[in-house]
């Protein structure tokens, strides 16, 4: 009675199979130090072997390679007693711990390190602690002792003693894991035995011995089916329970939503909970389908091996001897075809489940705001799944045809056997004897009816086989069409990706050019700001420079008014001479600003008429001052006789004449506001002209216009710069007060680009859904036809 198995496993604890394996030697390194704050030893253990392997694998982290903890002196003694019990040779290796350490740790009386730790030294003074050198020597001895213990008792044992792991023991495992492991092991053992029996077919030299092997093989296959069913049913049970719980909870929530009067928040929470239960139920269904596929894979693998081995055995025997084993071969073919058909149906369910998931993802894309490339990717995945589904359906039709062909061969064999039967009758010498043979004749007629029934069954099987062939041809055509669409979608995806890369490269080049232009603009602005600051600093240091410029300019203008060309030239020379002393007085000690000085004269191509290029006044004064500093003063020159009038000069180009006119105007009629502003870096000659100013042909016209008071100059309003502390709204209001005309914006029914992209996305999703549904509908049309194996059960 004691040897019988218990009815329940309550109170039993499963142990691991590899509970006492051969220990692997690891190199351990122990570090011991005294922690004066806690009054305990700090112990650290490093597994150098595991660290070296982790470093070779280039894995991050240090989990499982190092351990650390604190031990009191009493705890060290207890660990030593445990290790010495395992290995008695370790007893004399433990160094003696001084009693002062026990007093420092407070473990001798069990008082802890709380309030008593403050009162105890006042009542009973403790002996002096050992010195640092003694503690360091003691720690080194403990490290050596732990190293010896790891060599004698094993590193795992020392780690478990020093650093006990919290939780359950590692020697036990859960009941569910134990049951699953046991069932899997039994299934593997049965499959191994079946494989060994298949290998023993060559030892059977006679048909009688081979039939015994076949009988043993059938028994092992039935045992394999039983173990596989038990194992996979155990795997299926949690997912079935989850499916039932999720379905019942979902139905309860839907019933509550339909019947109860709930608020909007409660309704939203219940809907979210219902969707979560729906997701869990779908996950459970998917897991059930995957486990079912694995079960049929096991049975199909076993039957395939049995059929192949039997077909090899058929080659060793003749037709007459093999006739006894022929029914078993036909039965194996039928079983293999049926199991393969079940496997294909399970795969079909898995593929349809995946296809439905992709369709739901496509439907959820508008709410998630995904892009068009995600739609294309999901559609391509749907095409791939549909192609796999077509392959599965073709395999199902092939197995159905195999079943029909096997049945058809069996029926034809029966018909042949019936037709080959020969009935012998005794001769009759009288009518009475002939009447006595009537039952035998009726039996013969019954055999003919059986032959007719077999013939009709053969015709039905042929008709079903023809329908299967037509369905297979239709599926192949649809598969080819689906493959063409798949290739087309792949080409479109590649083209769009190529276009995206090309556009991206172009956009990168544009961004690079814009970035370079922005850097160049920033550099120009920075240099301009530096130049303006230098000019402003120069004007602040030389305030008399501008008054001298005004005086010289006014004198030169007055001297130029009554004369002609020769007087203008003399006045210009006099202007240079009079400007030199003033500038030499004011700007002799000031550093010269950085400005480009143009040459005073340029020769035309004919070489006859000199063309003067006017230089800004500041540059003239600076150049004059430098000449006055370097040369001694000269006596005044005697008056020269008037030269003969030169030939009239050719007309100047418009740009040069306008530049000269603008220069004279700026020299003569410069206001105080314009003098205070710094000069720009790049001078634009046409910036100061009015739009209707054509530019005079010579200086006489300029002087005549000045005499008549018709100077084509207009007052330029200086823009008032806003205060740095003013906000944007105040600047806008100030601009409105100055008379800025605001344009009325007409809000038209323009197309929002975001809405346009959303509409494009929705349209693409709708078209993709239509294509997916069309492809799925093409494959689902074949499910309406009855399966030819229904009658086979």
Curated annotation (Swiss-Prot):
Residues 632-654 have a biased composition (Pro residues). One of its GO terms (molecular function) is small GTPase binding. It comes from the Eukaryota. It is found in: Cytoplasm; Endoplasmic reticulum-Golgi intermediate compartment; Cytoplasmic vesicle membrane; Golgi apparatus, cis-Golgi network. Residues 556-661, 675-699, 772-793 are annotated as: Disordered. Transmembrane segments: none annotated. The keyword Cytoplasm applies. Residues 698-716, 728-745 form the WH2 domain. Residues 778-787 have a biased composition (Acidic residues). InterPro entries: JMY/WHAMM (IPR031738), JMY/WHAMM_N (IPR031808), WH2_dom (IPR003124). One of its GO terms (biological process) is positive regulation of actin nucleation. Interacts with ACTR3; indicative for an association with the ARP2/3 complex. Associates with microtubules; in vitro binds to tubulin heterodimer in a 1:1 stoichiometry; decorates microtubules with a repeat of 80 A along protofilaments. Interacts with RHOD (in GTP-bound form). This is WASP homolog-associated protein with actin, membranes and microtubules. It comes from Mus musculus. The gene is Whamm.
């Amino acid at each position: 009675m004691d040897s019988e198995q218990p009815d329940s496993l309550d109170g039993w604890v499963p142990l691991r199979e590899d509970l006492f394996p051969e220990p692997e030697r690891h190199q351990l390194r122990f570090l011991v130090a005294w922690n004066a704050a806690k009054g305990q030893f700090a112990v650290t253990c490093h597994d150098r072997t595991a660290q070296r392997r982790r470093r070779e694998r280039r894995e991050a982290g240090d989990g499982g390679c190092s351990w650390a903890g604190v031990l009191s002196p009493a705890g060290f003694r207890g660990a030593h007693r445990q290790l010495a019990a395992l290995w008695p040779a370790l007893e004399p290796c433990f160094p003696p711990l001084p009693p002062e350490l026990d007093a420092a740790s407070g473990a001798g009386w069990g008082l802890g390190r709380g309030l008593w730790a403050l009162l105890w030294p006042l009542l009973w003074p403790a002996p002096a602690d050992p010195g640092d050198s003694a503690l360091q020597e003691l720690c080194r001895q403990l490290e050596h002792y732990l190293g010896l213990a790891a060599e004698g008792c094993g590193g795992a044992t020392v780690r478990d003693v020093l650093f006990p792991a919290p939780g359950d023991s590692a020697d036990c495992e859960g009941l569910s894991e134990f049951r699953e492991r046991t069932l899997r092991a039994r299934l593997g053992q049965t499959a191994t035995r079946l494989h060994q029996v298949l290998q023993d077919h060559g030892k059977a030299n006679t048909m009688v011995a081979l039939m015994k092997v076949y009988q043993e093989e059938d028994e092992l296959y039935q045992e394999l089916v039983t173990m596989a069913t038990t194992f996979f049913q155990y795997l299926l049970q949690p997912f079935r329970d989850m499916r039932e719980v999720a379905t019942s909870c979902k139905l309860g929530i839907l019933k509550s939503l339909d019947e109860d009067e709930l608020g909007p928040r409660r309704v939203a929470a219940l809907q979210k909970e219902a969707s979560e239960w729906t997701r869990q139920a779908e996950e459970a269904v998917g897991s059930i389908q995957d486990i079912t596929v694995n079960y049929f894979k096991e049975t199909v693998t076993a039957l395939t091996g049995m059929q192949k081995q039997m077909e090899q055995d058929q080659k060793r025997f003749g037709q007459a001897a093999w006739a006894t084993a022929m029914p078993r071969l036909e039965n194996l073919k039928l079983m293999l075809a049926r199991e393969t058909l079940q496997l294909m149906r399970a795969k079909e369910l898995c593929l349809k489940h995946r296809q439905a998931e992709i369709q739901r993802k496509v439907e959820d894309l508008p709410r998630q705001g995904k892009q068009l490339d995600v739609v294309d990717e999901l559609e391509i995945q749907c095409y791939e799944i549909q192609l796999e589904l077509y392959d599965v359906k073709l395999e199902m039709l092939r197995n159905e045809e195999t079943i029909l062909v096997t049945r058809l061969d069996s029926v034809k064999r029966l018909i042949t056997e019936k037709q080959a039967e020969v009935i012998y009758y005794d001769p009759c010498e009288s009518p009475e004897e002939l009447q006595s043979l009537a039952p035998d004749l009726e039996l013969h007629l019954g055999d003919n009816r059986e032959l007719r029934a077999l013939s009709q069954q053969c015709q039905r099987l042929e008709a079903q086989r023809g329908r299967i062939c037509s369905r297979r041809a239709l599926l192949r055509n649809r598969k080819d069409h689906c493959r063409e669409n798949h290739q087309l979608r792949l080409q479109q995806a590649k083209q769009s990706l190529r276009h995206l890369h090309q556009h991206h490269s172009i956009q990168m080049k544009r961004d690079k050019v814009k970035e370079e232009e922005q850097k160049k603009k920033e550099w120009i602005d920075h240099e301009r700001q530096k130049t303006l600051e230098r000019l402003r600093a120069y004007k602040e240091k030389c305030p008399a420079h501008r008054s001298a410029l005004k005086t010289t300019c006014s004198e030169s203008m007055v001297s130029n008014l009554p004369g002609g060309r020769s007087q203008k030239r003399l006045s210009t020379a006099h202007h240079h001479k009079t400007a030199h002393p003033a500038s030499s007085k004011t700007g002799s000690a000031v550093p010269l600003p950085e400005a480009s000085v143009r040459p005073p004269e340029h020769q035309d191509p004919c070489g006859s008429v000199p063309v003067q290029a006017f230089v800004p006044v500041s540059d003239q004064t600076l150049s004059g001052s430098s000449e006055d500093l370097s040369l001694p003063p000269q006596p005044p020159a005697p008056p020269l006789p008037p030269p003969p009038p030169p030939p009239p000069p050719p007309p100047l180009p418009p740009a040069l004449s306008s530049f000269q006119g603008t220069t004279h105007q700026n020299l003569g009629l410069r206001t105080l506001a314009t003098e205070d502003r710094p000069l720009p870096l790049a001078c634009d000659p046409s910036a100061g002209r009015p739009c209707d100013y054509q530019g005079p042909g010579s200086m006489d016209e300029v002087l005549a216009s000045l005499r008549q008071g018709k100077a084509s100059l207009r007052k330029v309003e200086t823009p008032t710069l806003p205060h740095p502390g003013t906000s944007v709204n105040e600047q806008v209001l100030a601009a409105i007060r100055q008379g800025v005309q605001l344009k009325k914006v007409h809000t038209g029914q323009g197309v929002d680009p975001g809405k346009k992209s959303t509409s494009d996305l929705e349209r693409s999703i709708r078209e993709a859904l239509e294509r997916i549904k069309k492809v799925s509908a093409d494959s689902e049309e074949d499910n309406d036809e009855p399966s030819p194996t229904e009658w086979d059960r």
